Amino acid sequence: MQTLVNKIWYQGHPLQWLLLPLSFVFGFITFVRRGLFQLGLKAQTILPVPVIVVGNITVGGSGKTPMVIYLIELLRAHGFNPGVISRGYGANIDGVKQVAYNASATDVGDEPAMIVARSGVPMVVGSKRVEAANVLIAEHGVDVIICDDGLQHYALGRDIELVVIDGQRRLGNEYLLPAGPLREGPWRLKDVDFVVINGGNADVGQFEMQLAPTQVKAVDGNIITTDFDKSQPLVAMAGIGNPTRFFDSLQAQGYQVVLSHGFDDHQAYDKKQLCDLAKDLPLMMTEKDAVKCRDFAQENWWYLAVNAKLSPQFDEQLLSRLHEVVAAKQGNSHGIR
């Protein structure tokens, strides 16, 4: 099913034309919904601290999680105490839940588990993002909220909007769901503060982001190595929005990938499934996949950690905008744009 969806959205499959009427319905619903917030007919909560929303206008992964981790480190380096909120996709969450270090991806979602394992940031997950943010403010004294994947969650007021776009897939066929991958039309990009292109060329006013490999680490956490033998044959797997990007990266770095297998984004794994895939060869995966495999990982299962890299100009503009928000926050209200 996922293969067919990708063909429709990214390869011009003729089924897209049959789905277009449903896309018009979806577009009308989203237009009306956003308009209700703009007109004040639906309530939007304004928080006492700045809110940075990191999202996209497409379905599927685009590199938001590395971007969130980058922002955490950037803000900390400049004296801020950030916290993160997220829906916790794929987890069964009643209300809101604080994400503990080494939390199970089953309990909190794979991306929150990865973010906290990497950064140790205070993080709360749940569908009620305003409630999650208030927990961070009350219990952790955070002075900036980063909302992971909340661009269309208009009940939460925001001060800075940042959209991450996959530099390979871009916006696909540029149709709204279900004929295309778009949650909102391309026009929405004109309203946001920052557009970041992950692994591709940026247009004027946009910023490029590259994912730079750092270390190969054991999934079970027992070994950290920087001298992994790239000459040995291995199997690669990825359950992310664009698995091909990961496989291409391994090939470009000289890894001897004899088999690659892409899973659906947020895929749940079991030991037998992955042992059958690897067949005693080393298994290389993404960091996001690794947090779901820690409990049953074999000693020759590895993941490649990556860091987001952006320009100093991005840092300067983001921090400048944030300082403006901080200065104006007292007594001001920031509505939806």
UniProtKB/Swiss-Prot annotation:
ATP binds at T58, V59, G60, G61, S62, G63, K64, T65. GO terms for molecular function: ATP binding; tetraacyldisaccharide 4'-kinase activity. Its EC number is 2.7.1.130. One of its GO terms (biological process) is lipid A biosynthetic process. Belongs to the LpxK family. Transfers the gamma-phosphate of ATP to the 4'-position of a tetraacyldisaccharide 1-phosphate intermediate (termed DS-1-P) to form tetraacyldisaccharide 1,4'-bis-phosphate (lipid IVA). This is Tetraacyldisaccharide 4'-kinase. The lineage of its organism: Bacteria, Pseudomonadati, Pseudomonadota, Gammaproteobacteria, Alteromonadales.
